[in-house]
């Protein structure tokens, strides 16, 4: 069968590559994809991820069996709704269900209603009221833009000055446009963070192996929040009991609650969690595969990925089985200056020297007229390596990262140290 993946990042590269491993998959198309995907026999389609008419047209012409929509923007713009209305099977939540990611305020109200553990919070549209609440609560405190901000709309403020600046940027300077006209201020939670993704179809929840993402730009979890600078899976210091508790107290009630709200969720429900002294709590929900978590979790899936998605789309029970042994580590190469201002068009060197047993997931790359790869985004690519232990994975992966050393790019040297 032929399949279509919508999106252009490292996550979509990982999804497409995994689909190609499936027995009865002939071609995987990616719209719009990126040039690096071609190296893994993924067919690129020059259609924007939100061009509903173009995508539907192509899916019909290419006789696509089903579509997977990767990023949050097309999900919230109703691309899945459009495919379904056109009679094309699409995996991902419809726009009204993707709101669990699209609005932090909606997610908070939803969690309160269904008794899903999360930090206490309040939502504001007026700067003076928000500032007064901030003064009352003190620091540390967390300030979030209500809408989508590419993973950068959250400030964990340890100093009052930082908190006030974040609030001003969001509400007065409109740093994230309409996304930050409404702001959620929530209590700071201390603990170990981890990501738990699940395949969801209505009330049915099939959890994946957990991962740990590294949100901050610099070593030692310092610097601004990013889309994610690296990840690994599984997370040895988070016990199976904790994961089971998160599935039973967070994912299942969320899936059930969405059905009750008439927002039937079929797709990937991602819970960004923190293990507190009171058990796991929700930091955020996303309505799709995490990036960079997907690049370390999907390679660990032993079941046939295309068959799994097809089963969910046909309301059948899928086989979901992950590797129990070993660990997969992924490190992001980013453009210097990311997540703030960065240059595009910088040449990547050393790509041809990477070991064959290291996976390369392209994200912000493209080929120039000479066929050389240059940067086209903040997060450029991710290298991933599976090994028996984290020490082995780090020892094998970081020399490969060094082959890409270049003043125009940077990466964190400490991804995975917590799991050694």
Swiss-Prot record:
Transmembrane domains' residue ranges: none
Reaction equation(s) it catalyzes: 5-phospho-beta-D-ribosylamine + glycine + ATP = N(1)-(5-phospho-beta-D-ribosyl)glycinamide + ADP + phosphate + H(+)
GO biological processes: 'de novo' IMP biosynthetic process; purine nucleobase biosynthetic process
Pathway the protein takes part in: Purine metabolism; IMP biosynthesis via de novo pathway; N(1)-(5-phospho-D-ribosyl)glycinamide from 5-phospho-alpha-D-ribose 1-diphosphate: step 2/2
Residue span, ATP-grasp domain: 108-314
Keyword Ribosomal protein found: no
Single annotated GO MF: phosphoribosylamine-glycine ligase activity
Family: Belongs to the GARS family.
Protein name (Swiss-Prot/TrEMBL): Phosphoribosylamine--glycine ligase
The species this protein was found in: Listeria innocua serovar 6a (strain ATCC BAA-680 / CLIP 11262)
Lineage of source species: Bacteria, Bacillati, Bacillota, Bacilli, Bacillales
The gene coding this protein: purD
């Amino acid at each position: 069968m032929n399949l279509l993946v919508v999106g252009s990042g490292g996550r979509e590269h990982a999804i497409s590559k995994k689909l190609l491993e499936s027995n009865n998959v002939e071609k995987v198309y990616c719209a719009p994809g990126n040039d690096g995907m071609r190296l893994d026999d993924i067919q690129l389609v020059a259609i924007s991820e939100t061009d509903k008419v173009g995508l539907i047209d192509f899916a019909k012409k290419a006789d696509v069996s089903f579509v997977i929509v990767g990023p949050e923007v097309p999900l919230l713009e109703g691309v899945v709704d459009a495919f379904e209305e056109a009679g094309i099977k699409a995996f991902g939540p419809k726009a009204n269900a993707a709101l669990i990611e699209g609005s932090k305020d909606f997610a908070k109200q939803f969690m309160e209603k269904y008794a899903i553990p999360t930090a206490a919070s309040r939502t504001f549209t007026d700067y003076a009221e928000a500032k007064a609440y901030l003064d009352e609560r003190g620091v540390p405190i967390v300030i979030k833009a209500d809408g989508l901000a590419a993973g950068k709309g959250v400030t964990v403020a340890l100093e009052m000055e930082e908190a006030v600046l974040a609030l001003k940027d969001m509400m007065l300077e409109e740093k994230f446009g309409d996304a930050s006209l409404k702001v959620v201020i929530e209590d700071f939670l201390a603990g170990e963070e981890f990501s738990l993704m699940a395949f969801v179809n209505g009330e049915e929840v099939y959890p994946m192996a957990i991962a740990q993402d590294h949100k901050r730009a610099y070593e030692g979890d310092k610097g601004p929040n990013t889309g994610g600078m690296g990840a690994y899976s599984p997370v040895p210091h988070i016990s199976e009991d904790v994961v089971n508790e998160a599935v039973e107290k967070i994912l299942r009630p969320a899936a059930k609650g969405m059905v009750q709200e008439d927002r039937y969720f079929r797709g990937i429900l991602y819970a960004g969690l923190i293990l507190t002294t009171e058990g796991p709590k929700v930091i955020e929900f996303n309505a799709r595969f995490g990036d960079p978590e997907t690049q370390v979790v999907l390679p660990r899936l032993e079941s046939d990925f295309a068959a799994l998605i097809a089963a969910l789309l046909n309301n059948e029970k899928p086989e979901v089985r992950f590797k129990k042994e070993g660990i997969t580590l992924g490190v992001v190469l980013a453009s210097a200056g990311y997540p703030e201002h960065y240059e595009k068009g910088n040449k990547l060197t050393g790509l041809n020297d990477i070991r064959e047993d290291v996976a390369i997931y392209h994200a912000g790359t493209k080929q120039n007229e000479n066929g050389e790869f240059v940067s086209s985004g903040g997060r450029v690519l991710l290298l991933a390596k599976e090994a028996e232990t984290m020490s082995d994975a780090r020892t094998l992966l970081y020399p490969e990262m060094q082959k890409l050393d270049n003043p125009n790019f940077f990466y964190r040297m400490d991804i995975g140290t917590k799991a050694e």
